[in-house]
A protein has these predicted regions:
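Non-catalytic terminal extensions of PLP-dependent enzymes
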Residues: 2-6, 16-23, 33-42, 52-185, ...
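Conserved PLP-enzyme active-site core in the AAT-like
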Residues: 91, 96, 100-105, 212-386, ...
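A short glycine/serine-rich beta->alpha loop
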Residues: 152-155, 175-179, 204-212, 357-360, ...
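Glycine- and acidic
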Residues: 171-179, 203-209, 240-242, 266-271, ...
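Secondary-structure capping and boundary motifs in well-ordered enzyme cores
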Residues: 183, 210-217, 247, 251, ...
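Structured alpha-helical segments in the cores of large, soluble enzyme domains
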Residues: 188-195, 251-255, 279-287, 401-408, ...
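Hydrophobic alpha-helix feature that most strongly marks membrane-spanning transmembrane helices
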Residues: 291, 295-296, 317, 335, ...
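Active-site C-terminal subdomain of aminotransferase-like
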Residues: 326, 338-459, 463-471, 476
Length: 585
């Protein structure tokens, strides 16, 4: 049996000096700090005292020194007395140093900052403790909607912890600095190769680059098409004025930006009541010698339909028209190859010269990362590519920006090798099944389904109320926007849109993302049923008043007015001209 050794009482160590700052000057003096002492009973004592004397000079009772676990109770006047009796240093010029002292508190909400507004227009003069800054901003952001309940956006809202850790470790890396971060640059090249292979890009000739999203990728592709067209026209001695591009009126707003910024005329193929995508014959008929290209969409923003790239390609070949195709695969580029692999929309079509895809949508990476790929350097004019010697390394660059973080590219690489084709196929198959389940349920509730099913389009559900002509309720006194507002009160962000021009349709859209499980889908269905019941029980006048109130108090409705007043009522875009909603994607 082991014996227990009893520790001898620990001797009192030398007192620790404390430097105290006087309130009225910068002089310092030395006092002694009470030192913890381990008593023979194993407990730590209170404060020890020096020379057996009180700070006021009075004799300390002798039993105090002999009882190490007791302490004399003092007040602030004792310390003040010590300071007043200390010798003063000689007067000297004062340095202009900050007198600001940190404010310590036992709680963030007990600090003075909790009773102040967060700065909005001017940088504050003084610092704020980091824990308070974090909590104040976190509390402010808590008023945002829950991203997982935001069914308006295609943007990824879930990544694994390991992916997040890798990305966080790369926050400080400037991707453009190839010399210092060669592996990060090589990882981009690996991603370009893998995505190019997924899109059946010609081996050995295809080129590509990462971007901050599909908008930048589209801008680059449009620039390349315009420059190539301009060179061809100049070589033939023809005018290089008034270039145009053919596209559907359902395009995302970045296409309108590209045509406006780069001075290109739009030739629109308008949607109809029963067709929400481009018409191949009409698109090809609109082409002329000034057409720089045709935009086709692999998954439209509104209904998720895949436009018929193969049909347009075949018509161009059949009529011997030298017009290239760009495929906007922002949403569908990581879906179609796994759900409908036999669908020909990519570089298998000879007229397809460039493709963009968003890594931060169904590529399953947090925003923002996108990819732009070209069939051959022939379709990416050399005069658009800059060879830059930056920080010691020669590099070819074709981007609209320069510095950017490497973390999103690394996140994309993680997903590509972590999931592989099998993993992506499993995820996209689940999303397609969930979208079909939601489609069937909403259809049974009397909605008209506008989106495709069984993988023929993106995993989303676009739906609307039936009109009286379609057998809908003639007495229904609310629309899709009213239902969207009621769903928001339940936490769901289900957007209501005005469809593309000439279709004259209102609609709702649910984007089925990776984290939208069947259980969450059932919760949404229950809340749709609840909101429909509430709307049925609410009279027309009350609904109208509520809509007017929401419009008046737009900040609290989640639709704050962020447009600058000078630009609030623009009339140059499709939204300004026709009322089409520039939908979130």
């Amino acid at each position: 049996m082991n014996s227990v050794e009893v520790a001898e009482p620990t001797e009192v160590p030398e007192p620790i000096p404390i430097i105290e700052t006087s309130d009225d000057d910068n002089n310092t003096n030395t006092n002694t700090a009470p030192t913890p002492v381990l008593a023979s009973n194993g407990f730590t004592n209170g404060h020890s005292h020096t020379n057996g004397h009180h700070a006021h000079g009075h004799a300390t009772p002798s039993y105090i020194d002999s009882m190490a676990h007791l302490s004399v109770i003092r007040d602030d006047s004792d310390a003040a007395s010590v300071r007043s009796n200390s010798s003063r240093a000689s007067r000297r010029p004062q340095m202009q140093l900050s007198n600001y002292q940190d404010e310590f508190t036992t709680s963030v909400y007990g600090s003075r900052f909790a009773g102040m507004d967060l700065p909005r227009h001017h940088m504050p003069e003084c610092e704020m403790p980091r824990d308070i800054a974090y909590r104040m901003i976190k509390d402010d952001l808590s008023l945002d909607n829950n991203p997982m309940l935001n069914l308006a956006s295609f943007v990824t809202t879930y990544m694994e912890d390991e992916a997040e850790k890798l990305m966080a470790e790369s926050f400080s890396k400037n991707f453009i600095d190839y010399e210092e971060y060669p592996q990060s640059a090589d990882i981009q090249n690996r991603c370009v190769n893998m995505i190019g292979d997924l899109f059946h890009a010609p081996v050995g000739t295809a080129v590509g680059t990462s971007t901050v999203g599909s908008s930048e990728a589209i801008m680059l592709a449009v620039l390349a098409m315009k420059k190539r067209w301009k060179k061809r026209q100049a070589a033939a001695g023809k005018s290089t004025e008034n270039p145009n591009i053919v596209m559907s009126s359902a395009v995302q707003v970045c296409w309108e930006k590209a045509t406006r910024y780069f001075e290109i005329d739009e030739k629109l193929v308008y949607c109809t009541m029963d067709r929400y995508v481009i018409d191949p014959d009409e698109a090809v008929d609109l082409c002329d010698e000034n057409t720089i290209g045709i935009c086709t969409i692999l998954g439209t923003t509104y209904t998720g339909e895949y436009e018929d790239v193969k049909a347009i390609n075949d018509l161009l070949v059949e009529r011997n028209i030298d017009v290239p195709i760009h495929v906007d695969a922002a949403s569908g580029g990581f879906v179609a190859p796994f759900v409908v692999p036999d669908l020909e929309w990519d570089f298998r079509c000879e007229k397809v010269v460039s493709i963009n895809v968003s890594g931060h949508k169904y590529g399953l990476v947090y925003p923002g990362v996108g990819w732009a790929l070209w069939r051959d350097p022939e379709y990416l004019p050399q005069e658009l590519v800059f060879n830059i010697n930056y920080l010691g390394a020669d590099q070819s660059s074709f981007t609209l920006n320069f510095s950017k973080g490497a973390s999103q590219v690394i996140g994309q690489y993680y997903q590509l090798i972590r999931l592989g084709k099998h993993g992506y196929r499993a995820i996209m198959s689940n999303l397609t099944r969930t979208a079909d389940y939601l489609t069937e349920t909403l259809e049974k509730k009397g909605f008209v389904i506008m989106s495709e099913r069984s993988g023929a389009g993106l995993p989303l559900v676009a739906f609307r109320f039936r009109t009286p002509q379609e057998g809908g309720d003639e007495d229904r006194h609310y629309d899709e926007f009213a239902l969207a507002h009621h769903l928001r009160s339940r936490g769901w962000v289900v957007p209501a849109y005005t469809m593309a021009p000439n279709s004259n349709v209102k609609m709702l859209r649910v984007v089925v993302r990776e984290d939208f499980t069947k259980t969450r889908c059932d919760s949404l269905i229950s809340d749709v049923t609840l909101c429909l019941g509430l709307l049925d029980e609410t009279d027309r006048e009350s609904i109208k008043k509520r809509e007017e109130y929401i419009k008046k108090h737009i900040t609290t409705s989640g639709k704050g007015k962020h447009a600058h007043p000078s630009y609030a009522n623009e009339t140059h875009s499709l939204q300004g001209k026709t009322g089409k909603t520039h939908a979130i994607c």
